[in-house]
A protein has these predicted regions:
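Local sequence-structure signature of Cys/Sec-based thiol-disulfide redox active-site neighborhoods
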Residues: 1-27
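Short alpha-helical
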Residues: 13, 38-39, 72
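Cytosolic beta-strand hydrophobic patch enriched in CBS
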Residues: 53-57
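Non-catalytic, surface beta->alpha helical segment in thiol-disulfide oxidoreductase systems
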Residues: 58-78
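A short glycine-rich beta-strand->turn/loop micro-motif centered on a GG-aromatic cluster
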Residues: 7-8, 29-37
Length: 78
């Protein structure tokens, strides 16, 4: 199973759906809320994505990062 960094923000339905799926599949994640931490917002911008949720798998996984609620991509992390 591949751990991920999960960029989110307050009141984001896609973020809530992604978090529920991560938890239901028992995928290890670190949540970084860009509304609550300026440093996390800058990190999220550095990914090149402009919309949350942003999922960044561990670098050694070989899985590319993505933005948005994508259940099929999340399944690759299992």
């Amino acid at each position: 199973m591949t751990p991920v960094t999960f960029y989110t923000k307050n009141n984001c339905p896609q973020c809530k759906g992604t978090k529920m799926l991560l938890e239901s599949k028992k995928i290890e994640y670190t949540e970084r809320n860009i509304d609550e931490n300026e440093g996390y917002r800058l990190e999220a911008q550095a990914t090149g994505f402009f919309n949350v949720p942003i999922i960044v798998p561990s670098p050694d996984s070989g899985i590319k990062s993505w933005s948005g609620f994508k259940p099929d991509e999340l399944k690759k992390l299992i």
